[in-house]
Amino acid sequence: MVKVYAPASSANMSVGFDVLGAAVTPVDGALLGDVVSVEAADSFSLNNLGRFADKLPPEPRENIVYQCWERFCHALGKTIPVAMTLEKNMPIGSGLGSSACSVVAALVAMNEHCGKPLNDTRLLAMMGELEGRISGSVHYDNVAPCFLGGMQLMIEENGIISQQIPGFDEWLWVLAYPGIKVSTAEARAILPAQYRRQDCIAHGRHLAGFIHACYSRQPQLAAALMKDVIAEPYRARLLPGFSQARQAVAEIGALASGISGSGPTLFALCDKPETAQRVADWLSKHYLQNQEGFVHICRLDTAGARVLG
């Protein structure tokens, strides 16, 4: 049996709409992500387990893991009889790359089970395609970091889908999921069809400056440039208490904060453990909406998807 874990990810990172994403892992050692196991069988079967399994589609063919199996078999030109199990530990519509976790874990597990017939580039292209079935458009800012680890910049030129950019070891990512759902499709629909020239220029300056600051090892500058003029001004209205939370975490000492992916998860960057804990405590008390919400203090997950056991 092959068992693969795929970590949560925070896409956009305020400054890089659809072109930046970071894989994250809790500092306490908890696994924040999905697990898919594959073993040989007489015919295909899929079993759903985990905290959020009851949120999955009741029809198996609508489950993205089934679609991953189907697409993988098509790529190999044969039907591969396997028993698959999805441990759905990630909330759906959370802004933490939930669908990407399932897609990445499923495809890596199938590839491992079959002796790695597909290379990473081919796998990543397939992951983006399947993620697009859920979100409505092909984009790699969750699947790339989830699969490859670290902070990934989407390239999509010269046969390169994404490449890793250097992160900062001292950065702690406080992630607060309030327990409500925001669909990626809904969050995209709220965005304008056109942007003002000054916003386009500001976006380019922020993103170019952020990448420069990462490579020139200027963490304070990198954090200061994590500003969103593309999505956050429009999506903030979908997130109860978001504006107040951003102001509060800044006053506590967070270096930057914003919407993780399309929300509703809020991320806050800190460079001191005690600051991160105070931010986490405030968000636990004031940003969570129900019992399904949670807060994790994380670091970059540099490993990406990996075989367990």
Curated annotation (Swiss-Prot):
Annotated transmembrane regions: none
UniProt subcellular location: Cytoplasm
InterPro entries: GHMP_kinase_C_dom (IPR013750), GHMP_kinase_C_sf (IPR036554), GHMP_kinase_N_dom (IPR006204), GHMP_knse_ATP-bd_CS (IPR006203), Homoserine_kinase (IPR000870), Ribosomal_Su5_D2-typ_SF (IPR020568), Ribsml_uS5_D2-typ_fold_subgr (IPR014721)
Record-level GO cellular component terms: cytoplasm
Gene3D superfamilies: 3.30.230.10, GHMP kinase, C-terminal domain
GO molecular function: ATP binding; homoserine kinase activity
Catalytic activity: L-homoserine + ATP = O-phospho-L-homoserine + ADP + H(+)
EC number(s) stated in the UniProt entry for this protein: 2.7.1.39
Sequence positions that bind ATP: 91-101
The entry's keywords: Amino-acid biosynthesis, ATP-binding, Cytoplasm, Kinase, Nucleotide-binding, Threonine biosynthesis, Transferase
GO biological process: one example: threonine biosynthetic process
A UniProt-annotated Pfam family: GHMP_kinases_C
Pathway annotation: Amino-acid biosynthesis; L-threonine biosynthesis; L-threonine from L-aspartate: step 4/5
Principal EC category: transferase
Assigned protein family: Belongs to the GHMP kinase family. Homoserine kinase subfamily.
Record's protein name: Homoserine kinase
Gene from which this protein is expressed: thrB
